[in-house]
From Swiss-Prot:
A Pfam family per the record: FtsJ
Gene: rlmE
Active-site feature positions: K164
Stated name of the protein: Ribosomal RNA large subunit methyltransferase E
Molecular function in Gene Ontology: rRNA (uridine-2'-O-)-methyltransferase activity
Annotated binding of S-adenosyl-L-methionine, by residue: G63, W65, D83, D99, D124
Gene3D superfamilies in the cross-refs: Vaccinia Virus protein VP39
Main localization (coarse): cytoplasm
Amino acid sequence: MSGKKRTASSNRWMLEHFDDHYVKLAQKRGLRSRAAFKLEELQQKDQLIRPGMTVVDLGAAPGGWSQVAVKLVGDRGKVIACDILPMDPIVGVDFLQGDFREEKVLEALLTRVGADKVDVVLSDMAPNMSGSDGVDQPRAMYLVELALDMCHQVLAPNGSFAVKVFQGEGFDEYMKAVKEAFKVVKTRKPDSSRARSREVYLVATGYKL
């Protein structure tokens, strides 16, 4: 029974995906994922990224957010991307493949960042979904906590943070932790985010720790 449900769910996702306006637009514009439009919308509202900035993109593969970020920072800026999964090269993006929970990978990431710290940390990370809230939500919250921890390690004073969070158990506590670390925190639901998804984006500015 559960196998049939998964198949039906997968089929629905495939139909939605290929009939999706943003998927078609991404293909037309040469963007690697529809997620790129989410960052474009956040940028339009909150002006997170400016020319010359240094940006860290966590969970970067397949590279939609990095494509947007590298155009925004321009030739004088820097984008450092990290993911467990491989990612095809993007001109101007310094990509590190690995799990930044591992000491060796974290050290390599921090070396790339250098002593100057970064202006923006981005995280569009999400776990592989099992379909069980009791499993998926804790995994999702663990990833956003890792992203906030990365802010504490690399973000410059008054820096910014944009992170995908799934509403559910642990969300309120996480929001409180982000508000303690940043002067201003806004919740965004981009138009390009699927309506039935519980995902929202926290946009935090004015890092104060």
